[in-house]
Design a protein with these regions (language model features):
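Short His-centered aromatic/hydrophobic patch
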Residues: 75-76, 93-100, 116
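Conserved donor-binding/catalytic core segment of Leloir-type glycosyltransferases
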Residues: 175-193, 199-207, 211
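Glycosyltransferase donor-sugar binding loop
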Residues: 209-222, 237
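Acidic donor-binding loop of glycosyltransferase active sites
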Residues: 248-263, 276
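Conserved acidic donor-binding segment of nucleotide-sugar-dependent glycosyltransferases
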Residues: 292-293, 297-304, 313-318
C-alpha cells in the first residue's frame, strides 16, 4: 500500500517521522510530503521517502517574520497541485495548514484520512461551518482521545468516520540528574500552555525549582515578573534534541496546566517517554494517558491550588513519585509507534 503522509507546514516533524518509519516497518510504502523545517534539521528518513513540495520560498527566506505569511499563502495552491501529482492508495493529512484556503482548494485525489491533532485549531476554532465542510472530505478522521471523538461528534462528524488512535510516547533515555525538586515546564510557550499557572503552582508548592525549557512565541516579560523571587531557570529557543534530553533528565516532574483547546500534547508524551511523571489539568485528551497509566496526577482545569498540591505530593512523597514513574514506564511500553502504525493500517484498509 502506498501512503502519502502530508504535513504541509512541517508543524510536527518528529511525529511525522516516527509514524512514517513505523508504517514503513509494517510494510507500507510511505512518502512524507512536507516543507523545510524552519527551526533545525528534520529527522532523517528511515524506510520512507521525504519530499519538500510545500512553501519552497517562504520556509527558507523567513523564520519567524510575519512577512512570510503572504508569500506562504501564494505558495499554498502550488503545494496542493504538487501533492495531487503524487500517486497514493491513501492520502493522510496531519494538518490542514491554511483552512480558509483549503476549503476552496483542497480536493483529495485518493481516499483520505485527517488527523485532528488540535481538534479545531485555535485560530479558526470558532468557524465551525468551515471545519464541517473540510472534515466532510475525509473518509476517516483520527483523534487521539475519547474526548476528541466526543468533540468532533458534537460538531456533526459521523461517528462511523471517527477513529481513536492514542498518541504514542516519544521514548528516550536521558541521563537522570534530577535533584528531587525540579518542576519542568516544557514546550513552545504560548498563552494556552498556562505558564503563569505553572509559576504560581511552583511558588505554592514550597521547596521547588522551576525549569522553563521551550521556544517563546509570546512576550516573556509578564512571566518573568510573575516568577520574581522564585527559583527559575529559563532555557529559551528551539531546543535541539541534546538540550531536550538534558531538560528531561533534570526534571523530577513535568507540569502541563493547559487550556482546553487541544486534544493531546507532544511535550507531555516526551516527558512520559523519558520516564518523567506529569501533573496536568483535566482538559481535552491530555489527562487520558496520565490517568490511564497512573503516570502522575490530574487536577481540575484552572485550579492552581490543586496543581500546587499535586506537585507538593510528588516532590515530598518518594513512594508516590516512584509509583508515578512506574506509570510513565507503562505508558512507554504500551503507547508505541508500531501499535499506532498497525491501527492506522487497519483504517487505511477500510477505505483504500
Amino acid at each position: 500500500m502506498r501512503v502519502l503522509l502530508t504535513d504541509p507546514s512541517a508543524f510536527t516533524p518528529t511525529y511525522d517521522h516516527e509514524l512514517a518509519a513505523a508504517l514503513a516497518r509494517a510494510g507500507a510504502e510511505v512518502e512524507l510530503v512536507t516543507s523545510r523545517f524552519r527551526f533545525g534539521d528534520a529527522p532523517a528518513p528511515e524506510g520512507y521517502t521525504r519530499s519538500e513540495r510545500f512553501y519552497p520560498l517562504s520556509s527558507r527566506l523567513f523564520r519567524r517574520s510575519r512577512l512570510r505569511l503572504p508569500l506562504k499563502a501564494a505558495e499554498h495552491p502550488l503545494g496542493l497541485a504538487a501533492l495531487r501529482r503524487r500517486p497514493a492508495d491513501v492520502l493522510h493529512l496531519q494538518w490542514l495548514a491554511a483552512p480558509e484556503l483549503d476549503v476552496h482548494l483542497f480536493r483529495p485525489h485518493a481516499p483520505a484520512v485527517f488527523t485532528a491533532h488540535d481538534l479545531l485549531p485555535r485560530r479558526t476554532a470558532r468557524k465551525a461551518d468551515l471545519w464541517r465542510r473540510l472534515l466532510a472530505r475525509f473518509e476517516r478522521i483520527v483523534v487521539h482521545s475519547e474526548r476528541g471523538r466526543e468533540t468532533l461528534a458534537a460538531l456533526g462528524v459521523d461517528s462511523s468516520r471517527l477513529r481513536v488512535v492514542p498518541h504514542p510516547v516519544f521514548p528516550s533515555d536521558p541521563e537522570r540528574r534530577d535533584d528531587g525538586r525540579t518542576v519542568l515546564s516544557f514546550g513552545v510557550i504560548r498563552p494556552y500552555k498556562g505558564l503563569r499557572d505553572a509559576i504560581e503552582a511552583v511558588r505554592r508548592a514550597g521547596d521547588a525549582r522551576l525549569l522553563v525549557a521551550g521556544d517563546p512565541l509570546e512576550p516573556l516579560e509578564p512571566y518573568r515578573a510573575a516568577a520574581d523571587g522564585l527559583e527559575v531557570e529559563w532555557r529559551l529557543g528551539y531546543l535541539p534534541q541534546p538540550e531536550v534530553d538534558r531538560a528531561l533528565g533534570e526534571a523530577t516532574v513535568a507540569v502541563f496546566p493547559y487550556r482546553p483547546e487541544l486534544d493531546q500534547s507532544g511535550a507531555l508524551l516526551r516527558a512520559l517517554g523519558a520516564g518523567v511523571p506529569a501533573v496536568a489539568y483535566d482538559v481535552g485528551g491530555v489527562a487520558e494517558p496520565v490517568r490511564r497509566f497512573g503516570a502522575g496526577r490530574v487536577v481540575p482545569p484552572g485550579d492552581v491550588e490543586a496543581l500546587a498540591a499535586a506537585l507538593r505530593e510528588l516532590l515530598s512523597d518518594r513512594e508516590a513519585l516512584e509509583q508515578a514513574r512506574a506509570g510513565a514506564r507503562r505508558a512507554r511500553e504500551e503507547l508505541t509507534w508500531d501499535a499506532a502504525a498497525r491501527a492506522h493500517l487497519e483504517l487505511y484498509e477500510e477505505i483504500a
